[in-house]
């Protein structure tokens, strides 16, 4: 499960800063401020993990989202040597114990291993 993310130099987002993800979120902002770009970053990663890749992301596969070419997708205020970068912090539930434990208020399934990690990469 993704805990937080940061996007840099993608379309109108110069640097989103660290955005902590919650079960319910409201995105507010003026037109062209990056709301849709932020939301479209999730399908971008979905199309990347759905296939075996040589690189970290499936930029040119348009199954879920299409940002166009790199030059168009890069923020116009970004420095020439900077690329588009993504950083995700996540909790990795590697094993789920599916045995049922009977407690007064019901049955529970609990994670037996919970790890926090960070995944980041830059496209240039």
Model-inferred region functions:
Residues 1-124:
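P-loop NTPase switch/coupling surface
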């Amino acid at each position: 499960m993704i805990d937080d993310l940061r996007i840099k130099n993608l379309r109108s987002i110069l640097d989103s800063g660290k955005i902590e993800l919650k079960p319910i979120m409201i995105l507010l902002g003026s037109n062209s401020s990056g709301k849709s770009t932020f939301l479209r970053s999730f399908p971008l990663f979905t199309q990347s993990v759905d296939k075996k890749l040589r690189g970290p992301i499936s930029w040119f596969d348009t199954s879920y989202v299409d940002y166009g070419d790199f030059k168009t997708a890069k923020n116009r205020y970004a420095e020439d040597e900077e690329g588009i970068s993504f950083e995700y912090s996540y909790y990795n539930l590697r094993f789920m114990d599916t045995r049922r434990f009977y407690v007064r208020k019901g049955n529970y399934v609990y994670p037996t291993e919970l790890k926090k990690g960070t995944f980041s990469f830059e496209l240039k």
